[in-house]
From Swiss-Prot:
Belongs to the universal ribosomal protein uS2 family. The gene is rpsB. The keyword Nucleotide-binding does not apply. It comes from the Bacteria. GO terms for cellular component: cytosolic small ribosomal subunit. It comes from Streptococcus agalactiae serotype V (strain ATCC BAA-611 / 2603 V/R). PROSITE patterns: RIBOSOMAL_S2_1. The keyword Ribosomal protein applies. Keywords: Ribonucleoprotein, Ribosomal protein. One of its GO terms (molecular function) is structural constituent of ribosome. CDD domains: RPS2 (cd01425). This is Small ribosomal subunit protein uS2.
Amino acid sequence: MAVISMKQLLEAGVHFGHQTRRWNPKMAKYIFTERNGIHVIDLQQTVKLADQAYEFVRDAAANDAVILFVGTKKQAAEAVAEEAKRAGQYFINHRWLGGTLTNWGTIQKRIARLKEIKRMEEEGTFELLPKKEVALLNKQRARLEKFLGGIEDMPRIPDVMYVVDPHKEQIAVKEAKKLGIPVVAMVDTNADPDDIDVIIPANDDAIRAVKLITSKLADAVIEGRQGEDADVDFAQEAQADSIEEIVEVVEGSNND
């Protein structure tokens, strides 16, 4: 049984690609048709490939993989943080800092600084410092938490990276590829799929679409860690809709 049904994908707007003039020809095989100047993603392929992504992430999690969720644009930031936390994993949902993976030693030093500032406050050191210095420390902590808070407790560079919009997160993808870290990604019609190991053709600009896909991969982590099915209920929906119905509902745009 599919982990995500055609009906769920349709309702979340996963089928809406970008304007045809913005497409990447390498995504042609994942495109079903074009309507009103918008490419329509072939959701039959999305259903199958989402299954493959789920299995890949579940199996990795079962082997204690460290999984990093990445999505820094506003449509993705909240879902990426929430679902990574729910799965007990790690995330980056603000700007990707160049060298986050390839210069992990330096990043660890910044994380150590973040933990040091937190410890200073917890131990009461702030009460002994001038207000101006405390203000500077709080400002530094806020900035470090913004960019590194989601990986503060990540024990090592990730074994798997999940990306929302690899077109935007090109630096992150390149760092992962350089280090041999497999990348699972939501790939829209404007992106280059070549550097993605496990592709999920999907609208990566709609909040509902991002939430749907990201939550299912979080479920995969949970299932892998627990050795049992995550809490999903889609059995009656999975075969409810056909690809032909997509044409009838494509009247929207690539936004939530």
